[in-house]
């Protein structure tokens, strides 16, 4: 869990989620395929919510490799797990940063978003493209 956003708030939310008997929490890296395979084979989830990411526009300028590892490679592994274990649904978070220099407000999903202004936004837009292609190629809802 990164400290880019308030860790106390994250822990409080996680505590609430853990009260649900159908919620399983693991700490690790989304790049850890051994851990991901253990989790998927043990629980066989029917819904996967992928929120893991290295966040932050400014930090992506200083440390772009962490965005490659977490956002690109990590998301690739989540998509591969979905291809292998076939959950009923895979939900992924993106960011408004993908809209880049778009001036039309309010933002909406049908707007063009091909002008990312940060490496963070570029990795998240890449995640969207990867997820779209996996959904099409491997019938992942």
Regions found by a protein language model. Give the residues of each.
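N-terminal Rossmann-like NAD(P)+-binding domain of SDR-like oxidoreductases, especially those catalyzing
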Residues: 1-141
